[in-house]
Amino acid sequence: MTSVPDYEQSYVDRGRDRIGLRIHPEPAGAPRAPVVLLWPAMGVRASYYTPFAAALRAVGFAVVVADLRGTGASTPAPTRASRYGYAELAGDVGAVLGHLKSRIDGRTRLLVGHSLGGQAALLHVALDGGEQVDGVVLVAVGLPYWRVYPGRAGYGVLAGTQLISGCARLLGRWPGWGFGGRQAPGVVRDWAYTARTGRFPRRGGIDAEAAIRTVRTPVLAISVDHDRYAPGETLDYLCGKLTAAPVRRERYTVAESGTRLDHFTWVRSSAPVAARIAAFAAELPAR
């Protein structure tokens, strides 16, 4: 017997690519609920965030989870012909907001990003001006600049990111060997650039670093205990670029969760994170 999915699958066309969206049911008893648009980590499917979506719905949010380009329901898979990088991922955020316009008009809307998804969300606000967004939430996000990692970990980050970028350049894509899933060469190129330089890449004549400094949208930034990919130092470094935005910096601890945490497993015990996001949203001005 085939089970009926508890979400509506939708798609947004982006040239040769399309973005898959999981639109979860509206929370019970909350008409015109605030909306969370969730952007995943590199190579992580939207389906992985089902427990987090449930936790967000339980505290009163309408939830839409996107698949990043080339992952999950977003097709096609990356190939040598894929021509997108960070700038296009940021553009996808705006395209999805436009696609959802009839659903979200007049409602508070938050971009919630995990890892690469958080960078894409923040870049969208920086490059688009942020008029469509009331708040940004970064969970287990950082800029992976090798110099800010604790101890000697940064040397491994520098070597690993540049090796992966080199392989992607030679092969025409990153096959996902042990990390990040299959990725377009441009995504890996831009990711490796941030790790090497501590800066967002300049693409199409647009200075993303300067744009980030103009962001005024409120930001909730939550680091997660035992996150070796985005330790708190990398989130602090990223938040340091948000010189014009009100930033609330928090930490999700093992003591609070009552279970093991890392860059990925926090999703399975995310009710406390959802509660923090609800408190943050309650303080935002109504539309």
Locations of regions flagged by a protein language model:
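N-terminal cap/lid segment of alpha/beta-hydrolase-fold proteins
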Residues: M1-P25
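Conserved alpha/beta-hydrolase
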Residues: A46-Y48, A53-P78
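Conserved acidic catalytic loop of the alpha/beta-hydrolase fold
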Residues: A90-R107
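Alpha/beta-hydrolase-fold enzymes
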Residues: V112-R199
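Short beta-strand/loop motif that positions the catalytic acidic residue
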Residues: V215, A221-S223
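Short alpha-helix in the alpha/beta-hydrolase fold that links the catalytic acid
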Residues: P231-K241
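Catalytic active-site module of serine/aspartate enzymes centered on a nucleophile-bearing elbow/loop
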Residues: E250-R287
